[in-house]
Amino acid sequence: MSYSVLEALRNNPDHVRKVLAARRLDVSLVDRFIELDGRWRQLKREVDELRRSYNQLSREGARAPPDRRREIVEKARELAARLEKVEKEMEAVEREREELLWSFPNLIHDSVPVCPEGVDSVPVRHWGTIRVVKGAAAPEGVEYVVVEKPPVGHADMAEVVLGMADTLKAGEVAGSRFYYLFDDLVWLDFALAMYALDRLAQQGFRPVVPPYMLKFDVIRRVLDFDTFKDAIYKIEGEDLYLIATAEHGIAAYLHKRELVEEELPLLFVGWSPCFRKEAGAGNRDLKGIFRVHIFHKVEQFVFSLPEDSWKWHEEITKNTESLIRDLGLPYRVVNICAHDLGAPAAKKYDIEAWYPAQGMYRELASCSNVTDWQSYRLGIRVTRKGMRREFVHTLNCTGLATTRTITAILENFQREDGAVEIPKALRPYLEPIRAAPKEYIYPRRRG
């Protein structure tokens, strides 16, 4: 089976038009592709016919008497010249067609919502009781308790109350969206990573630390490079880009690999720093460590048989829900609207934690089924019974992004005296470390 987008363009172009419209993209791309693909097929037939004719003439020339051989050789020369010309035209059309095919986003699952302006997601489920400040509106259908006093925001908790982060000095020496993290928040960062790695490894995911940089020809195959080239960092003078997530390095691990059916699924849990320019963020979340240029993240990644990928999409989403739920953080799962999916994803869930000081849910994790969008570009196939070859499906899902999870803990677990209770699920990962906090993080003594 060939690439699903190519199959749809050839056999059901109206469906692709519908997908592009739902994604708010240019539907005329379909007509341009059909035109190029038709021209390529025509030239391919002509090339095949010319090759057959040339081979036949070559065989005739070998058997022909001397008086006919010169005539056959001349015809063969004419055919060879014609073949070379048509082959060059076919290759040029093929390059243009492939470039256009790469610009198409993934198809979308039937359950992906098509949303009106101003709506980016649809709630699916929620967990936990949220705290809502008196007088503020509560989300519909969510259990909540009213509190009189507004909680302290995560930025002020980290920098002012606890005194364990410094974005002002980091801004002086590195620029905005960088930070210094100190003392118990450092241990909390490591504990969150170990917690997620340990839990997921126990579920059969293989731990991996991927390369932190990838070559251009590789990174352009794992993400929508034209859209995100301004959001990732390039190493000056080198053919290398810093990864924005462990997903990129893990996906590239099987670049140009041929698998057999029995090898799948392959489950990985990666840890890496993530480097992001946050070019489109503007002035959003400038305070604190919620949206920063570098952070640590644990990532689930699955290479799956095509027929199993939707089952795995639900499974890895539930894995992350379990991690967040066991931390005691109220959250909800939302189904991302078609126009906000990003090109690779056929469907995406976001998992959002409740931030009581802000009075809203904010994204902690994202879980996508990319189907064969990445594997087509990376050349990752599986040979099925009967020697049928297919592109594998790839899926990714945040385990925990440590700095964001810290911000959610700071808002949800703060006490009146300024201390922050450490979620019970994290305490076993802090216990062996003598210098680490065990049950509470207390404000740093100053002076």
Curated annotation (Swiss-Prot):
Its main location: cytoplasm. L-serine binds at residues 245-247, 299, 398. It catalyses: tRNA(Ser) + L-serine + ATP = L-seryl-tRNA(Ser) + AMP + diphosphate + H(+); tRNA(Sec) + L-serine + ATP = L-seryl-tRNA(Sec) + AMP + diphosphate + H(+). CDD domains: SerRS_core (cd00770). GO terms for biological process: selenocysteine biosynthetic process; seryl-tRNA aminoacylation. It is found in: Cytoplasm. It holds the Pfam family tRNA-synt_2b. The keyword Nucleotide-binding applies. The keyword Protein biosynthesis applies. One of its GO terms (cellular component) is cytoplasm. GO terms for molecular function: ATP binding; serine-tRNA ligase activity. Keywords: Aminoacyl-tRNA synthetase, ATP-binding, Cytoplasm, Ligase, Nucleotide-binding, Protein biosynthesis. Homodimer. The tRNA molecule binds across the dimer. Catalyzes the attachment of serine to tRNA(Ser). Is also able to aminoacylate tRNA(Sec) with serine, to form the misacylated tRNA L-seryl-tRNA(Sec), which will be further converted into selenocysteinyl-tRNA(Sec). Consists of two distinct domains, a catalytic core and a N-terminal extension that is involved in tRNA binding. Belongs to the class-II aminoacyl-tRNA synthetase family. Type-1 seryl-tRNA synthetase subfamily. This is Serine--tRNA ligase.
